[in-house]
């Protein structure tokens, strides 16, 4: 991280429709702009609500991005207007979340989408959740508020979060927007910001063990074989040992050079598009779709569980449902691998627009890990998107 840059955290609002996610997003920007000027700009409800459409992995999603900062941190905050957009966003990882703010209306308590969003957050690896109990200005009864608080904590525990120790702040986003900066409802927004400030900073990709997906392989006369791709995580230095994993038997080699834009470097790091020179490896020994990794860090597998979203016809997806043993291609990192799908008990068929948990058996072993995202493709077009929730074998 460069000097003077604040540590960065990705936040997202989740929760049932009309419980106040977008209003809270507007209130966060507004209160912070009033209380901590500087880089904070007010973003109004309408600007967030008319979120522009974006494409992520071939799927169109409406997502609003706002940012705000505190003395010590910078936050990128994502809010999706529609329920379907949330599901697509979580599964495609269009906007990664380190922490989710679960918005629950004090008047309704937990609703079906509240549960669905918590489950999905868990499935896609959102580590931390803070709770905002909204619309507390219209609930006079303290006991009612305590019941909602208790119910949400139990629900979070049910889905594998630490419900007892999670911060739950009671407030009113609408009131915070209406009153001046020193009002009691604005203080509640600052209390929520305080809860975000306590969240542990995520480990940066650069600090993890080296991993790079192979995109292309070249033979350079007199120098050997060069593999190109984008370094996904970690750092690779000249002289480092490297495993080549996936599609074939594991091979071990040594990095004898790192190049970027035809310049020789000592090292490449997460985010770089680099060429890696490999010792004693012939061009035909490596192929697109394999990965280079730090020794012993990656294995290849054929079976996994995943959470998938199936595109609707209007999104360019299938026009008809599919059934068990459907065999599309799974686009994993840099390659398509054919696999067959097993459906959960009681599910006969899957309709375009559905999201569900499936099991996949691939034809060939590939280097995969929990939390990896993939596209489901048929004849080169994307028909679904998924995330690996468990490795089986």
From Swiss-Prot:
Full protein name: Elongation factor Tu
Superkingdom: Bacteria
Keywords tagged on the record: Cytoplasm, Elongation factor, GTP-binding, Hydrolase, Magnesium, Metal-binding, Nucleotide-binding, Protein biosynthesis
Chain positions covered by the region annotation G4: 134-137
Transmembrane domains' residue ranges: none
Molecular function, one GO term: translation elongation factor activity
Region (G3): 79-82
Location in or out of the cell: Cytoplasm
């Amino acid at each position: 991280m460069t000097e003077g840059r604040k540590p960065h955290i990705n936040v997202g609002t989740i929760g049932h429709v009309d419980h106040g996610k977008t209003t809270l997003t507007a209130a966060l920007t507004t209160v912070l702009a009033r209380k901590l000027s500087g880089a904070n700009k007010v973003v109004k409800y309408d600007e967030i609500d008319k979120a522009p459409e974006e494409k992520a992995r071939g799927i169109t999603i409406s997502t609003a991005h706002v940012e705000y900062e505190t003395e010590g941190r910078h936050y990128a905050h994502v809010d999706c207007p529609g329920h379907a957009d949330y599901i697509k966003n979580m599964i495609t990882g269009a906007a990664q979340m380190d922490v989710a703010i679960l918005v629950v209306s004090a008047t309704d308590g937990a609703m079906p989408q509240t549960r669905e969003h918590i489950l999905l957050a868990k499935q896609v690896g959102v580590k931390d959740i803070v709770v905002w109990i909204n619309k507390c200005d219209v609930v006079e009864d303290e006991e009612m508020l305590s019941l909602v608080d208790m119910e949400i904590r139990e629900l979070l525990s049910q889905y594998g979060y630490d419900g007892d120790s999670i911060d739950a702040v009671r407030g009113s986003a609408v009131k915070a927007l209406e009153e001046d900066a020193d009002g009691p409802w604005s203080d509640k927004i600052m209390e929520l910001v305080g809860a975000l400030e306590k969240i542990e900073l995520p480990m940066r990709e650069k600090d993890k063990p080296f991993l790079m997906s192979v995109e292309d392989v070249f033979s350079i006369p007199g120098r050997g074989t060069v593999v190109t791709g984008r370094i996904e995580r970690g750092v690779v230095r000249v002289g480092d040992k490297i495993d080549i994993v996936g599609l074939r038997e594991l091979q071990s080699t040594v990095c004898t050079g790192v190049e970027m834009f035809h310049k020789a470097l000592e090292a490449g790091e997460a985010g770089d598009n680099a060429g890696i020179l490999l010792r004693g490896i012939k061009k035909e020994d490596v192929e697109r779709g394999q990965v280079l990794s730090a020794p012993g860090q990656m294995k290849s597998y054929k079976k996994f569980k995943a959470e998938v979203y199936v595109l609707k016809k209007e999104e360019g997806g299938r026009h008809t449902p599919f059934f068990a043993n459907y065999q599309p291609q799974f686009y994993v990192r840099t390659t398509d691998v054919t696999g067959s799908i097993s459906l959960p008990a009681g599910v006969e068929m899957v309709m375009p627009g559905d999201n569900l948990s499936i099991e996949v058996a691939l034809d060939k072993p590939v280097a995969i890990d929990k939390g990896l995202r993939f596209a489901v493709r048929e004849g080169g077009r994307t028909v679904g998107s998924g995330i690996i929730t468990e490795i089986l074998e």
